[in-house]
UniProtKB/Swiss-Prot annotation:
Protein's recorded name: Orotate phosphoribosyltransferase
Enzyme Commission numbers on file: 2.4.2.10
Residues binding orotate: R157
PANTHER family for the chain: OROTATE PHOSPHORIBOSYLTRANSFERASE, URIDINE 5'-MONOPHOSPHATE SYNTHASE
Intrachain S-S bonds: none
Required cofactor(s): Mg(2+)
Reactions the enzyme catalyzes: orotidine 5'-phosphate + diphosphate = orotate + 5-phospho-alpha-D-ribose 1-diphosphate
Subunit structure: Homodimer.
Reported function: Catalyzes the transfer of a ribosyl phosphate group from 5-phosphoribose 1-diphosphate to orotate, leading to the formation of orotidine monophosphate (OMP).
Pfam families xrefs: Pribosyltran
Pathway membership, UniProt: Pyrimidine metabolism; UMP biosynthesis via de novo pathway; UMP from orotate: step 1/2
Binding annotation for 5-phospho-alpha-D-ribose 1-diphosphate: R97, K98, K101, N125, D126, V127, I128, A129, S130, G131, R132, S133
Protein's gene: pyrE
Length: 206
């Protein structure tokens, strides 16, 4: 794939996310308490296989040069992305259990799947804000003896998550920063007038 073709694929992905309502403008509160005028909710993607596959392909193109034999999606939205990557590129996947009942030995298992201590695992996520959810997943994997060196995400909201991961020894690779995403929306998408106005105002503060 040429750089021009990849750029077209990126713009196509953003346009489709806007079309299915995964990108919305307004007044929103993020899970970490921060306020924002643009909300990217990737949950609708699981109902759109073509969009899901495009995003999974873009994320996988970020993969590092070193050998990583496993991947794990951050629960829950990124599970579909990780599964899509696993099937499309034939790479093994493990599953982090978010809820532990502690009622039996089986329920105390943090990570499901076949793996060996010492293997390197890539953490896949849809959107990074504070970085907390990626760190929680990384810790669960590391507790089972896996090595976590990098995380691949679709969108970096540029609110400090990358620095948090770096401090923990994890390199972040993202398909889009929030600034890139908004620029793509403004230049390539037919936005509603109110959304275009909010996007234009937002880009001035990024």
């Amino acid at each position: 794939m040429t750089s021009f073709e990849e750029e077209q694929l990126r713009d196509h992905a953003v346009a489709n996310l806007y079309r299915i309502g995964a990108i919305r403008f307004g007044d929103f509160n993020l899970s970490d308490g921060q306020k924002t005028h643009i909300y990217v909710d990737m949950r609708p993607v699981i109902s759109c296989p073509d969009v899901l596959q495009t995003i999974a392909s873009l994320i996988w193109r970020l993969r590092p040069s070193f050998n990583s034999s496993l991947l794990c999606g951050v629960p829950y939205t990124a599970l579909a992305l990780a599964t899509c990557i696993s099937l499309k590129y034939n790479i093994s996947m493990v599953l982090r259990r978010k809820e532990l009942k502690h009622s039996s030995q089986e329920d105390r298992i943090k990570v499901e799947g076949l793996f060996s201590s010492g293997q390197t695992c890539l953490v896949i996520n849809d959107v990074i804000a504070s970085g907390r959810s990626i760190l929680e997943t990384a810790k669960a994997l590391e507790d089972e003896g896996l090595n976590i060196r990098e995380s691949l995400v679709f969108l970096d909201r540029q609110v400090g998550g990358e620095a948090v991961l770096k401090e923990a020894g994890i390199k972040l690779r993202s398909v889009f920063t929030l600034e890139d995403l908004v620029k793509s929306l403004l230049s390539k998408c037919e936005l509603k007038d109110t959304d275009a106005a909010m996007a234009s105002a937002l880009i001035k503060n990024l």
